[in-house]
Amino acid sequence: MQLFHLCLVISCSCPTVQASKLCLGWLWGMDIDPYKEFGATVELLSFLPSDFFPSVRDLLDTVSALYREALKSPEHCSPHHTALRQAILCWGELMTLATWVGNNLEDPASRDLVVNYVNTNMGLKIRQLWWFHISCLTFGRETVLEYLVSFGVWIRTPPAYRPPNAPILSTLPETTVVRRRGRSPRRRTPSPRRRRSQSPRRRRSQSRESQC
């Protein structure tokens, strides 16, 4: 908590720790969810276990490899690019602050406490945020939301009644496309030769299948 007060003192216009507490109380009174404008929620992300998300270094490498030029561009690309910019800058400032606090704390136990708090609590939130926006840019927002809902249903289902493996994000678009393309040609363009040679019972059976 003291570290968070220090963050507020440095980053906002509150000149004292007492003022930062007032600022903190105001922030706590607001229902701020960074995922709501994108159709998700913090609770929806919380279904994914902490070890699901890649490390900060891996996520930064992914961002740099895929979206470096877009993030450096002065033009607005998408809300996801903007959110990534802000989250990356926030993490950089937090690392600078944690380093400064660690270097100025004489007690080794206090230094370890600061480092562990940042890595465990703030690090997880940053990893969740980066993963969400990177995935939305890579797979599409609707696919990511569908995955979060599917995983939430899977994880809440008792093991005896669910598939052994959790849903995989990268397979959702491919599976959906294959299903849509695989069924529609049979319904729309049946073979004329087949239609003439089939018995009435077979035709009725096919008609029922096409409605599924």
From Swiss-Prot:
Gene Ontology MF annotations: DNA binding; RNA binding; structural molecule activity
Subcellular location: Secreted; Host nucleus
Site (Cleavage): 183-184
Alphabetically ordered keywords of this record: Disulfide bond, Host nucleus, Host-virus interaction, Repeat, Secreted, Signal, Viral immunoevasion
Top-level taxon: Viruses
Stretch forming the signal peptide: 1-19
Main localization category: secreted
Region (HBEAG): 25-27
Subunit structure: Homodimerizes.
Function: May regulate immune response to the intracellular capsid in acting as a T-cell tolerogen, by having an immunoregulatory effect which prevents destruction of infected cells by cytotoxic T-cells. This immune regulation may predispose to chronicity during perinatal infections and prevent severe liver injury during adult infections.
Name of protein: External core antigen
Species of origin: Hepatitis B virus genotype B1 subtype adw (isolate Japan/pJDW233/1988) (HBV-B)
